[in-house]
């Protein structure tokens, strides 16, 4: 068993590269099946969010997995390789546990990543790329993330990218009581944004979504107005703040649409926060006067303040993930020991069966019983002690006293 984790995130790559290696929801099922086919166990999970893309595989070759990622997205090795990180064995286990616990997030301790990891695991199960080891790994990871939440203060005053976006809006507008907000998307992140906006007394909210029913369902809770994406041009001129987070592969707001809206607003300033990957708002919008565009990469100052306040809780959480990752590896080793014992017994039984059959044939042909039994005993002894004798000889010749001692203990040579 060899667990491998390979990824790219907000710490190692720009939003431009991150959006190139992201997997869209409608393609991730087939992507997981394709990735799993490159492993010896057929086990693989892809975690793809706006801030990270990570591949978790059991019994996969690191170079082969990286090659698959580059081929899948049509990217050059020299562009991707410097931004990748990789973990093996216990380090891979700990990394996943840290990710799910929010310890590796853009905003330390944010809870949304756990839901995203769970969703990735569900999709992998649907794709048939989960077996014993990966299943146990992710189930344990979810338990560890819960343990971190309940036993530390990492989740106190819970924050997220959504919280950071609203904090930035408050910083720029000082008060949100007179501002009108257009939210694009109706997923978990936008729902959190709406919650924070409501808590801060925003004047009004409009939610635009591809599926009107989903937007309407969300709007009931926040007393907001639901519209379709096609209606955005009609509502954009009224928006002081635009916050967007969808899974659209193409930008939803273009420079021309925003420019037209600003003219209708008589050039009153508009704050646009794009927290989607790939981006929902064309980067050229930032060139417009009175349009202030920010992406997830612009939220670092808020994030750094958050990290400082949660440092102590994070240290406690790190200890939990460290301990639990070792416990998981103990379970993995127990599986390996069971396999080894099974193989050893099977091998010994095969030798016995072979030699017994040979002895019975000789007896059937009239061989002397005593001579046949002595030959059977000698042959069985020689076959069974051959491998241990070779191992003892090599360890002794190399002066490897540690291995020699372990072999003597295993063979019962040091018993009184």
UniProtKB/Swiss-Prot annotation:
During catalysis, the active site Cys acts as a nucleophile attacking the alpha-carbonyl group of tRNA-bound glutamate with the formation of a thioester intermediate between enzyme and glutamate, and the concomitant release of tRNA(Glu). The thioester intermediate is finally reduced by direct hydride transfer from NADPH, to form the product GSA. The active site is at 50 (nucleophile). It comes from the Bacteria. PANTHER family: GLUTAMYL-TRNA REDUCTASE. It comes from Shewanella sp. (strain MR-7). Belongs to the glutamyl-tRNA reductase family. This is Glutamyl-tRNA reductase. GO terms for biological process: protoporphyrinogen IX biosynthetic process from glutamate. Possesses an unusual extended V-shaped dimeric structure with each monomer consisting of three distinct domains arranged along a curved 'spinal' alpha-helix. The N-terminal catalytic domain specifically recognizes the glutamate moiety of the substrate. The second domain is the NADPH-binding domain, and the third C-terminal domain is responsible for dimerization. GO terms for molecular function: glutamyl-tRNA reductase activity; NADP binding. The keyword Iron does not apply. Pfam families: GlutR_dimer (PF00745), GlutR_N (PF05201), Shikimate_DH (PF01488). Its EC number is 1.2.1.70. It catalyses: (S)-4-amino-5-oxopentanoate + tRNA(Glu) + NADP(+) = L-glutamyl-tRNA(Glu) + NADPH + H(+).
